[in-house]
């Protein structure tokens, strides 16, 4: 005999509708979260730009070795900015591709849901079987999409080609960038080798121990040596002849070159590379000529230089109001001496 199943079928249909509504609510929440994330990304555009230039500045500092000219620094900075912009453009293109793929999957998911809703069955057993089959189909489709994605990309790459008449130098090109990076690295290594060769060259430095009168000595140093290393060697030579230096240390000595007090951490290489100048002569020459202030035309710049003075700091503190110590002032790399002075 046929049995009455009205109540059971109604209950099954109600359960199915509740499940569908719950799924729709979850999808709506996911869409809201996605929109909120996109808004956050748009709001942080300024931060990305600031981070971009901070990264360029950091890269410029780390890749700069020793002192370089202003033109070299500008060229290096422009190259780093261009490279950084190319990297950001690649990232943006990759993000756009991901968003497009997500939107495509979302559209397919919505179509599938509409199809499911339209084909609802009031038979509970049939609904459960359909759900199992559909979930399996979705998983298979998702796996198939992931497998087909590289194939589609390959097909697009095969179909698209570059027009030889169009300038594409502004577009990202992995091969070209790798070649540029390789050349840049070769140039950097070659430049470093040249600088190391310059630093290892020997120079003869004439200096004068100044205690109110001059006592000249000479010493051989390398261009890469620091002022502190030079003073240490000079102190070893002078201790034999001057008793006040026997208990003195390097930190108690000062090096005066062209009326400028040179800090201990600078090297001779720094002044040679930058062609630095002092108040009364060039800082990049360490041999000695006649006093440039006694030549016929002192307004004409020459390469002649004076013997640098090695002075006890205690002597300077006592006599800094008296010539020649009254002319001395700390070396400032930002200050330019366009003309030599005698007062």
From Swiss-Prot:
<dbReference type="GO" id="GO:0006397">
    <property type="term" value="P:mRNA processing"/>
</dbReference>
<keyword id="KW-0507">mRNA processing</keyword>
<dbReference type="GO" id="GO:0008380">
    <property type="term" value="P:RNA splicing"/>
</dbReference>
<keyword id="KW-0508">mRNA splicing</keyword>
<keyword id="KW-0539">Nucleus</keyword>
<comment type="function">
    <text>Probably involved in the regulation of pre-mRNA splicing.</text>
</comment>
<dbReference type="InterPro" id="IPR007005">
    <property type="entry name" value="XAP5"/>
</dbReference>
<dbReference type="InterPro" id="IPR048337">
    <property type="entry name" value="FAM50A/XAP5_C"/>
</dbReference>
<comment type="similarity">
    <text>Belongs to the FAM50 family.</text>
</comment>
<feature type="compositionally biased region" description="Acidic residues">
    <location>
        <begin position="125"/>
        <end position="142"/>
    </location>
</feature>
<feature type="region of interest" description="Disordered">
    <location>
        <begin position="1"/>
        <end position="25"/>
    </location>
</feature>
<dbReference type="Pfam" id="PF04921">
    <property type="entry name" value="XAP5"/>
</dbReference>
<feature type="compositionally biased region" description="Basic and acidic residues">
    <location>
        <begin position="172"/>
        <end position="181"/>
    </location>
</feature>
<dbReference type="GO" id="GO:0005634">
    <property type="term" value="C:nucleus"/>
</dbReference>
<dbReference type="GO" id="GO:0006325">
    <property type="term" value="P:chromatin organization"/>
</dbReference>
<feature type="region of interest" description="Disordered">
    <location>
        <begin position="125"/>
        <end position="181"/>
    </location>
</feature>
<protein>
    <recommendedName>
        <fullName>Protein FAM50A-B</fullName>
    </recommendedName>
</protein>
């Amino acid at each position: 005999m046929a049995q009455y199943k009205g109540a059971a079928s109604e209950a099954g249909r109600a359960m199915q509708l509740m499940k569908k509504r719950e799924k729709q609510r979850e999808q709506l929440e996911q869409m809201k979260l996605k929109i909120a994330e996109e808004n956050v990304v748009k709001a942080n555009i300024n931060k990305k730009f600031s981070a971009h230039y901070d990264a360029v500045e950091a890269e410029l500092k780390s890749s700069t070795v020793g002192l370089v000219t202003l033109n070299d620094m500008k060229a290096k900075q422009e190259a780093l900015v261009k490279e950084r912009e190319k990297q950001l453009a690649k990232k943006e293109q990759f993000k756009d591709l991901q968003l497009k793929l997500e939107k495509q999957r979302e559209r397919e998911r919505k179509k599938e849901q509409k199809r499911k809703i339209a084909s609802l069955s009031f038979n509970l057993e049939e609904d459960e079987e359909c759900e199992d089959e559909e979930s399996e189909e979705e998983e298979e489709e998702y796996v198939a999409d992931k497998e087909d994605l590289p194939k589609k990309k390959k097909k697009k790459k095969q179909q698209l080609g570059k027009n030889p008449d169009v300038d594409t130098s502004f577009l990202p090109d992995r091969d070209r960038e790798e070649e540029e990076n390789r050349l840049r690295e070769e140039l950097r290594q070659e430049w470093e080798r040249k600088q190391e060769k310059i630093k290892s060259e020997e120079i003869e430095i004439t200096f004068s121990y100044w205690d109110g009168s001059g006592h000249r000595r000479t010493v051989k140093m390398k261009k890469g040596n620091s002022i502190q290393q030079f003073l240490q060697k000079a102190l070893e030579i002078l201790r034999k002849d001057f008793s006040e230096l026997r208990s003195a240390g390097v930190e108690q000595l000062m090096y005066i070159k062209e009326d400028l007090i040179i800090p201990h951490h600078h090297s001779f290489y720094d002044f040679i590379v930058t062609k630095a100048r002092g108040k009364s002569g060039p800082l990049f020459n360490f041999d000695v000529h006649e006093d440039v202030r006694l030549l016929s035309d002192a307004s004409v710049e020459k390469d002649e230089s004076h013997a640098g003075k090695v002075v006890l700091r205690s002597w300077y503190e006592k006599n800094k109001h008296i010539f020649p110590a009254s002319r001395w002032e700390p070396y400032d790399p930002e200050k330019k001496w366009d003309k030599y002075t005698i007062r």
